[in-house]
């Protein structure tokens, strides 16, 4: 099995759209880019795929985001999310979403860098697995 480059430390590995209108977003992006979508059982989450490969997701924005424009978020793979989160904080990052476990996926942390950009880091449960 070949290594998935997106699972290497420092690689962009996942994108998610938070929007007030999930159905409209699904229609737009499937028509525009040829993506396919698949509902994730037991979650309010739509998996976005190109071919057989999951590349991201679409989900409803939380109530506290009412009035905010839809936005894409990106995840960067790291070898140790806890250590990298501590390092980000030491370098001046502000926590947006604290360290959080995603069942059967991994653990992530979302922060705002000192310049104001928001990004998420993630360590996948099985770093050698395909996405």
State what each model feature region is:
Residues 2, 9-54, 90:
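Core segments of cupin and vicinal oxygen chelate
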Residues 1-2, 57-60, 72:
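Short, flexible segments with low predicted structural confidence
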Residues 1-8, 12-20, 47-49, 64-87, 91-131:
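Vicinal oxygen chelate
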């Amino acid at each position: 099995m070949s290594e998935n480059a997106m699972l290497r430390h420092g690689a962009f590995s996942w994108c998610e759209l938070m929007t007030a209108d999930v159905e409209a977003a699904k229609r737009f992006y499937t028509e525009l880019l040829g993506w396919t979508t698949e509902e994730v059982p037991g979650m309010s989450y739509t998996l976005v795929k190109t071919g057989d490969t999951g590349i991201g997701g679409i989900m409803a924005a939380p109530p506290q985001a009412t009035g905010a424009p839809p936005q894409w978020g990106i995840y960067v793979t790291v070898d140790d999310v806890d250590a990298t989160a501590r390092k980000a904080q030491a370098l001046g990052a502000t926590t947006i979403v604290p360290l959080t476990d995603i069942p059967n996926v991994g653990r992530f942390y979302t922060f705002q860098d000192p310049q104001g950009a928001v990004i998420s880091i993630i360590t996948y449960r099985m770093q050698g697995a395909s996405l």
